[in-house]
Amino acid sequence: MTLLPSPKLKLKTDNQSLGDKTALRRKLIKQAGLEPLRVLDLFAGEGTIWGSLRQPARLKNAPEALNVESYTPIDSVARQPGQIRFKITPRLIAALDEGGGLSRYNCVDVDCFGDPFAIWQALLFRIRVPTAVFLTRGRVTYGAGRMPISKLAKKVMGIPEEWDVPGKVELMEYGDRCQLLQPCPTAKIAFGYKITLRRVDYYALLVKPTEAHATT
């Protein structure tokens, strides 16, 4: 599967680009035909992204509001009404999925500040219905030419955990790709889009379960 970046979405903006994020989500959701949406918003913050996507159009040529049937925001700090306050970890994803609970959602947003791939892995192996997954991958440099490489990235790339690997950009990008496209017997990425900016990547992915693991 090849991630296909859309030239129309490659906007030169900063890491906080609401326009990029909302355009990317609209494009995938409309193409996948997932409405009405049942949204699980991880790292929800003040709910700015989904507040914008649900807002009725005020201008003539503005896009229509997305049809959101339910919205569940979760973050470690309470910043909006109705939010669940909890630290976002793979253990939380497992708890949410007890009794097949993740099947209640057909849209999962992981708009974190750093590495989303531990959460991505926890989600991928539990998806039982066609689901839009949105990932924000931020990059922070620690020292000259170094960035942190997670234990999961090393594992997926086949690098021993104890090795002190130079955090070069090329290796980080390869590690991200390996984690994103890791083999999964229960679900696969049907198609996706990616926006690459200087310090952040935005991914929009439609994930479908295999026939044997789909929830009817």
Regions found by a protein language model. Name each.
Residues 1-61, 74-103, 107:
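S-adenosyl-L-methionine
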Residues 40-42, 65-75, 108-110:
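Short, hydrophobic beta-strand segments that form beta-sheet elements in well-ordered domains
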Residues 130-144:
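Conserved beta-strand signature within the Rossmann-like core of class I S-adenosyl-L-methionine
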Residues 152-210:
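A conserved mid-domain beta-alpha-beta active-site/ligand-binding segment of alpha/beta enzyme cores
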Residues 37, 106, 131:
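Conserved acidic residues
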Residues 33, 127-128:
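A generic alpha-to-beta junction signature in SAM-dependent methyltransferases
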Residues 114-127:
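A short, conserved alpha-helix within the catalytic core of class I
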